[in-house]
Design a protein with these regions (language model features):
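A composition-driven surface/loop motif
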Residues: 1-223
Length: 223
């Protein structure tokens, strides 16, 4: 559960039908998905095409329980053709820059009960955690694209920094979750010259019109 994995160049960094992270430090740079959980043979990006591209696969899981995970992906950051469950750990995702992929991508459910995650990507296919979670999360699309290497900060109403990350790619959509988020509280998202506020009004707060159009398993419209 400890140790270091440093993948500096890959097509898909980590791939399997069930991927469980219980500790350690993992860093992935990929030309497609950072972590990909799928059943069947490896058919590359074509396994997402066809009539059943959004159907959930039985026995396919991505589980993050502990550890530190950093993803720099041209495709989906964290991709599960089944379920995604996060109970702990720290996760930072950078990418994708094209609207055909998402920082998070799942076909089943995405549940967060603990840990910290901040994931930045393009607008178009973005997804957040589902309302079956027990920890608050936000999926927020900014008004315009943020340049690469601009620091992103999430601060509370007192100006205390809750989360921060400096993506190395352009982005417009962010997913974040932390045990510090509280219902009814207002938080400020600052990135480059942009600054927007969001008020937590439920287990999932979202203004996204992405893959699930702000509803379904990606979470409801929050404001």
């Amino acid at each position: 559960s400890d140790g270091t994995v440093d993948i500096t160049k890959s097509y898909e960094g980590i791939e399997g039908s069930i991927v469980t992270i219980d500790g350690g430090t993992i860093s992935v740079v990929s030309s497609d998905d950072g972590i990909n959980c799928a059943g069947g043979s490896d058919t590359g990006s074509t396994d997402r095409m066809g009539a059943d591209q959004f159907s959930s696969q039985d026995g396919v899981e991505l589980n993050i329980n502990r550890g530190t995970v950093t993803i720099d992906a041209e495709g989906d950051g964290l991709d599960s053709n089944g379920n995604f469950t996060m109970t702990g750990g720290t996760v930072c995702v950078c990418g994708p820059t094209n609207g055909g992929n998402g920082a998070l991508d799942y076909n089943g459910t995405a549940t967060v009960t603990g840990g910290t995650l901040i994931a930045c990507g393009a607008v178009g296919m973005e997804e957040g955690f589902g309302d079956n979670s027990t920890q608050y999360s936000v999926l927020h699309d900014l008004g315009s694209t943020v340049s690469a290497n601009e620091k992103l900060t999430i601060t509370d109403s007192d100006g205390k920094e809750i989360l921060s990350f400096t993506p190395t790619k352009t982005w417009q959509s962010v997913v974040f979750t932390s045990a510090d988020l509280k219902e009814g509280e207002t938080y400020t998202i600052t990135a480059g010259s942009q600054s927007e506020t969001v008020t937590i009004d439920g287990i999932v707060t979202s203004n996204s019109k992405g893959k699930n159009f702000g509803g379904g398993h990606g979470g409801r419209r929050g404001f």
